[in-house]
Amino acid sequence: GDVYKRQSDERLKLKQRIVHDVLEKYKNIPKDDAIGILSSVGGFEFTCIVGVILGAAANNALVIIDGFNTSACALVAKTLVPQAMDYVMASHLSAEKAAKSSLENLGLEAYVDLGLCLGEASGGSIQMGMLDLAVHMYLAVTGGKA
């Protein structure tokens, strides 16, 4: 119990120190310099997700973001191409502290709040099931006519 708590506290302090150091190092990057922010602190995975969002929007395809990390990517995409948000949907309201404000900044609303914070796209999986059901019901009611 005590050993685990001490290790958890130490890991949290290390993470906080790393975040502080990164913010200090890159404090001069303007907030609207999406490429500068992404290239400094985003990493390969975040860059790929931003590309998926922009590519989907360019092809009139929907992207479901799932959790805070993908919300951060969507914020970068929005800075680059604000119209891309017309093709982004939030799967759920993550339990992470900044989730609500990030969705508000994106102009998105979460359809469900399940307290998820798993990092396994579980919210997106639930949202896909809900969308599939909604389309199925719509087609049943309209006789298959769009």
Language-model features, listed with the residues they occupy:
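Terminal helix/beta-alpha structural elements that buttress the NAD(P)+-binding lobe
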Residues: 7
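Flexible, glycine/charged-enriched surface loops at secondary-structure junctions
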Residues: 26-37, 60-67, 115, 140-146
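Hydrophobic alpha-helical bundle architecture
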Residues: 51-71, 75-90, 110-116
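Active-site rim loops that border cofactor/substrate pockets in soluble metabolic enzymes
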Residues: 15-55
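Active-site-proximal loop->helix
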Residues: 12-17, 76-81, 99-106
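Internal helix-turn-beta structural module
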Residues: 96-143
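Short, small-residue-biased leader/transition segments that mark boundaries at the very start
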Residues: 1-4
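Conserved active-site and cofactor/substrate-binding residues in soluble primary-metabolism enzymes
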Residues: 10-18, 44-51, 68-72, 93-97, ...
